[in-house]
Amino acid sequence: MSLKRPAKDQPNTFEFNSSSLDAANAIIAKYPEGKQQSAVMALLYIVQRQNNNWIPLAAMKYIAKFLNMPYIKVYEVATFYSMYNLSPVGKYFVQVCTTTPCMIRGANKLVEACKEKISEKEAELSNDKSCSWMEVECLGACVNAPMMQINDD
């Protein structure tokens, strides 16, 4: 696993579009008064869907203001969970599980194939910008090891 770092090239601003804003407000409305910050994970997911499957720093700051919470708390959540992408990903985003059961059953061969066919380094776009890959923690299907996921499938 590699350390998750935000992309070097970042947009200066972010704002929810109308459908994302409606979705965010609907989620926040489900939380009791004073507990709306608990919606941070759901709002990060909404941002990622709106922003071509990655979350820029400006969006994390936007969520922090939206939920009236410190930016660092949003950043901590976004960098902790592997489901949040902090840099642009390709139209085809390959995630390879490299935890013990998958490594024992050949995940290293999947990683090598990704390096050869997509990009030498994980989290980098392919030459045609259509694909990217990264190592992830358990995808919850150890019985099928080695396991990989493309986009949400």
Model-found features: residue ranges?
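Signature of N-terminal electron-transfer/Fe-S-associated modules in redox systems
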Residues: 1-153
